[in-house]
């Protein structure tokens, strides 16, 4: 970026290895924020798509050929010298070994403990997003029964589940409280995090990690609730925008496909989902009529991951 840049489109790569590490590069001397660490990438040229800019920049900067890249987040960041629109991609497969072709230092990093500093300001929110797993499970104790659900939850946790929403609309509050307490205890024993649907007081009572706001709560909310994690259930571009305005950690966007729980509802379909997710600055999970095998499609359409209800258990 030069001093003359005022509104710049940038393609940014989060190169992720199977072991969970990701690549950061140090900005060279003589450029704005020299010495700061960032995700690699560069300016989108006139007539170029952000994806093609990504492929070109990674070849020029790192000497690699992109094989698989997924659109992820779009964030606008204002520096003193420029306003930049950052189009983030998760790059999971490439040919060649990344090396600094322009003399820049590179470092593979792992969250939560970064060994490089300082981090470019626009990249800091990305670190929180990277810590979110790709599967978000929603409880189904109403159909399974509490004891069977908790058994299935323990099994899922043993198999790597790390994010859970407790959502049982028809449970009396004392029953819901007991379920939530037990689910939080199980989840925390495996390093997983739990959000409670809609009930902020209950989330505080049971020591949950966060709350999942309904659309009505989102509309009425003046500020982000005080939790480690806060998300919202969205059905429109306007609701997604509001969730991002409140700096929520992520959003659910639904229904993508026809669902058993909402028969006859108008579903978005993948193309509308992709259009709505493309302009979102926070991670979006796809929900509605999905199965685990839809994860790849969800990534291609710009989702961070998928949320499952019946299919999770």
Describe the predicted segments one by one:
Residues 214-223, 250-264, 289-313:
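Glycine-rich phosphate-binding active-site loops on the catalytic face of alpha/beta enzymes
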Residues 133-148, 229-234:
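Active-site mouth loops of central-metabolism enzymes
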Residues 17, 75-98:
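Active-site-adjacent beta-strand/loop module that shapes the phosphate/pyrophosphate-binding cleft
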């Amino acid at each position: 970026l030069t001093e003359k840049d005022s509104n710049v489109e940038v393609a940014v790569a989060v190169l992720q290895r199977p072991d969970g590490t990701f690549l950061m590069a140090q900005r060279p001397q003589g450029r704005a924020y020299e010495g700061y660490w960032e995700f690699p990438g560069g300016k989108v040229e006139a007539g170029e798509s952000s994806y093609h800019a990504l492929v070109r920049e990674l070849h020029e900067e790192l000497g690699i050929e992109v094989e698989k890249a997924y659109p992820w987040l779009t964030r606008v960041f204002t520096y003193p010298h420029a306003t930049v629109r950052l189009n983030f991609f998760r790059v999971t497969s490439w040919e060649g070994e990344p090396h600094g072709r322009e003399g820049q230092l590179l470092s593979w990093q792992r969250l939560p403990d970064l060994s490089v500093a300082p981090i470019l300001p626009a990249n800091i929110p990305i670190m929180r997003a990277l810590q979110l797993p790709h599967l978000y499970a929603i409880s189904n104790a109403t159909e399974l029964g509490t004891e069977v659900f908790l058994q299935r939850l323990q099994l899922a946790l043993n198999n790597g589940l790390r994010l859970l929403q407790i959502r049982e609309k028809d449970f009396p509050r004392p029953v819901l409280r007991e379920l939530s307490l037990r689910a939080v205890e199980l989840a925390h024993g495996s390093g997983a995090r739990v959000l409670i649907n809609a009930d902020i007081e209950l989330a505080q009572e049971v020591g949950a990690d966060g709350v999942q706001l309904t659309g009505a709560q989102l509309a009425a909310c003046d500020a982000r609730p005080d939790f480690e994690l806060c998300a919202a259930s969205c059905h429109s571009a306007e609701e997604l925008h509001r969730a991002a305005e409140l700096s929520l950690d992520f959003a659910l966007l639904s229904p993508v496909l026809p669902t058993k729980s909402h028969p006859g509802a108008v579903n978005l379909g993948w193309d509308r989902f992709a259009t709505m997710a493309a302009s979102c600055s926070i991670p979006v999970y796809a929900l509605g009529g999905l199965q685990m095998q839809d994860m790849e499609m969800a990534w291609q359409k710009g989702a961070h991951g998928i949320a499952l209800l019946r299919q999770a258990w």
